[in-house]
């Protein structure tokens, strides 16, 4: 049985990897057809550029893409996010550059931290009265595009990291 690679699928994955690995340059060439195809992926801005790319068909609600990074016990976390005029949330999680479409503790932790931070800020700055309920996570994440990228040292299993709670509170 012969395996036939789809250049479109490969391009999508190479683009993801280049966004997730700041500064990495990937050159993809397809020489199977008479007319050779070549595409280069290189993003110095990493996941910030990923969010910009994902938001290109929407209007951003603020100019800056918010970016945070941290490292604890061999677990590196990067988050980039920006709200836009859409009504849906688009949060994408990755562990060691592998998409986690079902979510995971890194996504749950991110969403919980985002909701808590917004509500704490709103209370501290009197944007919410004491008698008013907190903003819901769904309302806060409406129109959000976010990338949550977690990188774990190879000698640590994802299960070990989950058990240590490193992906839930960073």
Q: Language model features by range: what are they?
A:
Residues 8, 15-17, 23, 27-163:
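GHKL/Histidine-kinase-like ATPase module
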Residues 4:
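Flexible active-site lid/hinge loop adjacent to a nucleotide/diphosphate
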């Amino acid at each position: 049985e012969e395996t036939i690679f789809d250049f479109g699928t490969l391009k999508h994955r190479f683009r993801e990897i280049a966004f997730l690995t700041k500064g990495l340059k990937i050159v993809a060439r397809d020489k199977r057809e008479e007319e050779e195809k070549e595409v280069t992926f290189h993003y110095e801005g990493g996941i910030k550029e990923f969010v910009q790319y994902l938001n290109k068909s929407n209007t951003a609600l603020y100019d800056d893409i918010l970016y945070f990074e941290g490292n604890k016990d061999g677990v590196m976390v990067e988050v980039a996010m920006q709200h836009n005029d859409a009504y849906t949330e688009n949060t994408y999680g990755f562990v060691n550059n592998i998409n986690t479409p079902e979510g995971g503790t890194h996504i749950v932790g991110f969403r919980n931290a985002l909701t808590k931070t917004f509500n704490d800020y709103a209370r501290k700055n009197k944007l919410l009265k004491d008698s008013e309920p907190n903003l819901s996570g769904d309302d806060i994440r409406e129109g959000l595009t976010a990338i949550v990228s977690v990188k774990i040292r190879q000698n640590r299993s994802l299960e070990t990291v989950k058990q240590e709670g490193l992906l839930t509170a960073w």
